[in-house]
Structures are given as structure tokens and as C-alpha cells.
């Protein structure tokens, strides 16, 4: 089985498809273990973020697609148009580019590297990685570090978190006059909340499934921040001007009815809602309501493109470095795959040498001259070593040009 990757991202699939194929963080360890023990793959890493779901495997790409469809209980033909399947070399290049932020919605964004490390850690804990994927991701992390150190690809990038504040500022003139509600307390919400906190909003509230985690984030923010439970949302939603949500829930947390009731109490005051979750936390129908301004990760594209032109110059240098590293890695892997063949070839050569030497010793014992024995030995050794290649070439003829070219290369006859 060969190294391969199957996936979809923000470039190939809309949010409505991506959310159907996302893996919840809590379910991912079991999923990657299941995949690596299925008929589809022998090694597996699953990367699932708001912008991509990718399965890096040693396996059969068609069976991996089938597994993905079955896991999410979807018809295979519904998802196939949005998927890409990559061969060994394409998989290596793709992994390097993703880790370097070259394939991200935000060119050069650093968060993806941490997400890949989390995915690899989960696979390692489930013993779902073997020699091939371990080698791939060790090199991936090394290349990502080198690209980010030696190029300016990540400089001045507008992150999804900072873009959230920019978007709110397009609707409200002063963040300092606003009440801001964060739904969830994970990494994305922590990043977004940090940017909002720098603008000193009037009030910040973190709603989470557990109060302790919400309080922990409030303590980090160190401003007017207070915790609450998700169950409090229907009663408090109307008090907030800005709502940012990013949880791991597989079902919407905020429905159209809840927002309708909040808007009535707000008396035509606008409600800015940013849903950064995949699957979505806020029902899409909320966007149809007057005075509700609902944005999703796909709506952030234009905002995060700010400064992209300057970063694209750095990206060109990064792409060159990635290409060099891909070629280097592929050569190393092909060299390792050739080790058993090289050993077998040398064993055959040694076997031929011993046979010819044994015959030569017998000839010397019978009184043949050294000159005669050496002449016969050299002819026999030449015949033995070239018999198989010559026979194979005669059978192949001119039709198998790849074989003819390979033999010419091996014996340096193509000069």
C-alpha cells in the first residue's frame, strides 16, 4: 500500500458540505483508530478543521473515500465531486504546503501547524501511524519550521481572530460601547476574545458547557469578563451586540427562534453574529432575520485577504523551498524502498562469484594454467551477471521503452 491523501477544503467544498464531513474532536481518536484498522488503510492521520478535512493514509484511496462516506452515513456520490485524491508525491507536497500555511484561507497563518500536530498526536496515541506516516510528518514539521524561519510568508497575516474584530468594526463604530458574547471556550474563542479584549468592550461573557472552563478563560482575559452556561443563552442573548461562536457541537446551539425572541427585546438594535464553527453553531436561517447580521467562516475570505499581495511574494520563495524538500524526501523514501532489492541483487552477485570461483579452483587443481583459469573465470562471471538482464531485454524488445531506458541508465549506456 502506498502513501496517499483524500480530502476536501475551503477551495473545493462549501461550508454546507465541509460540516457534513467534519470530525468532532471527541470522536476523532476512535475514528482514526477505526480507519487504520479497516480494509482501507494500514496507517492513518485525520486532520479536521473549520476549513478542511483530510485523511493522510497508507492505503487505497478509493477504499478511503468509501470509508469516509460510510463513517458519516453519506452517499459516496454526494461527496465525491468535492474530494481530491493525491498520490505519494502529491501527498508529500500537500502536507508540506498545508503545514506552512500555503494552502490556508489566510496565507501563512500559523494555527494550522498546531492543528496538524494535534492530529498526529491523536493518531500516535491510537497507534494508527507506522514508518511511512511518521517519516512524512517528522519531515513536514521540519519543513514548516524552516519555511517560517527563512521566509516572510507568515508576516503581517490577518488571522481569522483579528478579522472577527475588523468585521464587527464595520457594523459598530466603537467596540468599547458593546456587550460581546462568546459561545465556547476553546482555542479559537480564546484567540478571538483576546483581540476583542484589546478593544475594551463594555462587557464580555463566555458561555460554555462547563462553568469552570468559562471562568478559566475569563481570568485569562483580565477585563470585564464573566462566565455563564450554555443553558443560560435563551435568557441572556438579547443583552449582547456581538456574538461569536465556536464549539465542537455536532448540532446548532443557537436557533432561529432564540434569535427572533432576542431581536424583539432589542427593539431593532442590530445583532452581529459570527459563527466560526464547523459544523455550524448558529442555524443558517438566522441570516434571514432583519437586524441579524450572520457571518460564517466562508464569509471571512475578503477580510483575511488584507496584506495578501505582500505575503504572496514571500510565498513564492516558500514554494521553491517546499519543492526542494519534496524532491529530497521522495528520494530518501525511494532509497529506503530499494534497500531490500539492493541486498537481493548483491546476494545474487555473491552467489555467482562463489560458483565461478569454485569452478576456477577445480580447474587449477587439475593443472590448468592460471592464465587459462582467469580467462575462463572472467567469461563465466560476465555471462552469469548479464544473462538475466539480456534475456529480459530480448523478451521486452522495443515495446517496453521504460525498461530499456532503465537498463541503459543502470549500465550508463545512455550517454
Curated annotation (Swiss-Prot):
Annotated substrate binding sites = 49-52, 104, 109-111, 115
Keyword Glycoprotein applies: no
Task: Quote the catalytic residue positions.
Answer: 50 (nucleophile)
Describe the reaction catalysed, as an equation.
Answer: (S)-4-amino-5-oxopentanoate + tRNA(Glu) + NADP(+) = L-glutamyl-tRNA(Glu) + NADPH + H(+)
- The residues annotated as site (Important for activity) are 94
Q: What does the UniProt keyword field contain?
A: NADP, Oxidoreductase, Porphyrin biosynthesis
Q: Listed disulfide bonds for this chain?
A: none
Transmembrane ranges, per UniProt, are: none
- Look at the named UniProt entry and state the broad enzyme category this protein falls under: oxidoreductase
User: Pathway listed for it?
Assistant: Porphyrin-containing compound metabolism; protoporphyrin-IX biosynthesis; 5-aminolevulinate from L-glutamyl-tRNA(Glu): step 1/2
Query: Binding residues for NADP(+), per the UniProt record?
Result: 184-189
- Domain notes per entry: Possesses an unusual extended V-shaped dimeric structure with each monomer consisting of three distinct domains arranged along a curved 'spinal' alpha-helix. The N-terminal catalytic domain specifically recognizes the glutamate moiety of the substrate. The second domain is the NADPH-binding domain, and the third C-terminal domain is responsible for dimerization.
Oligomeric and partner information: Homodimer.
| Miscellaneous section | During catalysis, the active site Cys acts as a nucleophile attacking the alpha-carbonyl group of tRNA-bound glutamate with the formation of a thioester intermediate between enzyme and glutamate, and the concomitant release of tRNA(Glu). The thioester intermediate is finally reduced by direct hydride transfer from NADPH, to form the product GSA.
The free-text function statement in the UniProt record for this protein reads: Catalyzes the NADPH-dependent reduction of glutamyl-tRNA(Glu) to glutamate 1-semialdehyde (GSA).
The cross-references to HAMAP family, in alphabetical order and at most eight, read:
Glu_tRNA_reductase (MF_00087)
The family this protein is said to belong to: Belongs to the glutamyl-tRNA reductase family.
Q: What is this protein called?
A: Glutamyl-tRNA reductase
Task: Give the organism, scientific name.
Answer: Neisseria gonorrhoeae (strain ATCC 700825 / FA 1090)
State the taxonomy lineage: Bacteria, Pseudomonadati, Pseudomonadota, Betaproteobacteria, Neisseriales
Amino acid at each position: 500500500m502506498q502513501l496517499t491523501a483524500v480530502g476536501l477544503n475551503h477551495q473545493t467544498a462549501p461550508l454546507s458540505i465541509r460540516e457534513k464531513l467534519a470530525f468532532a474532536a471527541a470522536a476523532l481518536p476512535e475514528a482514526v483508530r477505526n480507519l487504520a484498522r479497516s480494509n482501507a488503510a494500514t496507517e492513518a492521520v485525520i486532520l479536521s478543521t473549520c476549513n478542511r478535512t483530510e485523511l493522510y493514509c497508507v492505503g487505497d484511496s478509493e477504499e478511503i473515500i468509501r470509508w469516509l462516506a460510510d463513517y458519516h452515513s453519506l452517499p459516496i456520490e454526494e461527496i465525491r465531486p468535492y474530494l481530491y485524491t493525491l498520490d505519494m508525491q502529491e501527498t508529500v507536497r500537500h502536507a508540506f504546503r498545508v503545514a506552512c500555511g500555503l494552502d490556508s484561507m489566510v496565507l501563512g497563518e500559523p494555527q494550522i501547524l498546531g492543528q496538524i500536530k494535534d492530529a498526529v498526536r491523536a493518531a500516535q496515541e491510537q497507534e494508527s501511524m507506522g514508518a511511512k506516516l511518521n517519516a512524512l510528518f517528522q519531515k513536514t514539521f521540519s519543513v514548516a519550521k524552516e519555511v517560517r524561519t527563512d521566509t516572510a510568508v507568515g508576516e503581517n497575516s490577518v488571522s481569522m481572530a483579528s478579522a472577527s474584530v475588523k468585521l464587527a468594526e464595520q457594523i459598530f463604530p466603537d467596540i468599547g460601547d458593546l456587550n460581546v458574547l462568546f459561545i465556547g471556550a476553546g482555542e479559537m474563542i480564546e484567540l478571538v476574545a483576546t483581540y476583542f479584549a484589546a478593544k475594551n468592550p463594555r462587557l464580555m461573557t463566555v458561555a460554555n458547557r462547563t462553568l469552570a472552563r468559562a471562568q478559566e478563560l475569563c481570568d485569562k482575559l483580565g477585563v470585564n469578563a464573566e462566565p455563564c452556561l450554555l443553558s443560560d443563552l435563551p435568557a441572556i442573548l438579547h443583552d449582547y451586540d456581538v456574538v461569536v461562536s465556536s464549539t465542537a457541537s455536532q448540532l446548532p446551539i443557537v436557533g432561529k427562534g432564540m434569535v427572533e425572541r432576542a431581536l424583539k427585546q432589542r427593539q431593532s438594535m442590530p445583532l452581529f453574529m459570527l459563527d466560526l464553527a464547523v459544523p455550524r453553531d448558529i442555524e443558517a436561517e438566522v441570516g434571514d432575520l432583519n437586524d441579524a447580521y450572520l457571518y460564517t467562516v466562508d464569509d471571512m475570505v475578503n477580510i483575511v485577504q488584507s496584506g495578501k499581495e505582500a505575503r504572496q511574494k514571500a510565498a513564492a520563495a516558500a514554494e521553491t523551498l517546499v519543492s526542494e524538500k519534496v524532491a529530497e524526501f521522495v528520494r530518501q523514501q525511494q532509497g529506503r524502498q530499494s534497500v531490500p532489492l539492493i541486498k537481493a541483487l548483491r546476494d545474487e552477485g555473491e552467489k555467482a562469484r562463489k560458483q565461478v570461483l569454485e569452478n576456477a579452483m577445480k580447474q587449477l587443481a587439475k593443472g590448468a594454467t592460471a592464465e587459462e583459469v582467469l580467462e575462463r573465470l572472467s567469461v563465466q562471471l560476465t555471462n552469469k551477471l548479464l544473462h538475466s538482464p539480456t534475456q529480459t531485454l530480448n523478451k521486452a524488445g522495443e515495446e517496453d521503452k521504460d525498461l530499456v531506458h532503465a537498463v541503459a541508465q543502470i549500465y550508463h549506456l545512455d550517454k
